[in-house]
Swiss-Prot record:
Region (AP1-binding): 1-60
Domain comment quoted from the record: The leucine-zipper is involved in homodimerization.
Highest classification ranks of the organism: Eukaryota, Metazoa, Chordata, Craniata, Vertebrata
Subunit relationships: Can form homodimers, however it is likely to function as a monomer. Interacts with NFKB1. Interacts (via N-terminus) with JUN and FOS; these interactions inhibit the binding of active AP1 to its target DNA.
Keywords, ordered alphabetically: Cytoplasm, Nucleus, Phosphoprotein
Transmembrane region(s): none
Annotated Pfam families: TSC22
Positions of region (Disordered): 101-137
Induction conditions: Induced by dexamethasone in lymphoid cells. Induced by Il4, Il10 and Il13 expression in monocyte/macrophage cells. Transiently induced by Il2 deprivation in T-cells.
Annotated protein name in UniProt: TSC22 domain family protein 3
Phosphoprotein keyword on record: yes
SS bond partners: none
Leucine-zipper: region residues: 76-97
Amino acid sequence: MNTEMYQTPMEVAVYQLHNFSISFFSSLLGGDVVSVKLDNSASGASVVALDNKIEQAMDLVKNHLMYAVREEVEVLKEQIRELLEKNSQLERENTLLKTLASPEQLEKFQSRLSPEEPAPEAPETPETPEAPGGSAV
């Protein structure tokens, strides 16, 4: 790197950033598509133009990411709303079933829950036809 022609650390940093940006975008575009050498002979206008192109590309990426994130947030909000509604409906149904169940049915249900704790296996057993209460669905 030929940095002796630059007088301030800022000029050196800008030179290094430009070289990095050019090589990065060249690799993205597939090889030596961009062959620009930045030195004292490069005009200020071309440096500014390159800066503007890089900034535009970064803004475009940022805008696309923000749009995608907003879209995903809306989808997740809708899923949360649907789950809250379903949860509320199931809680109302559970309360109704508890009020309609006989003490014997409640006792039988509690006895199934006690030894197994959360009863994921209760629906799998085919012994449920004994309950005279009918289907909850």
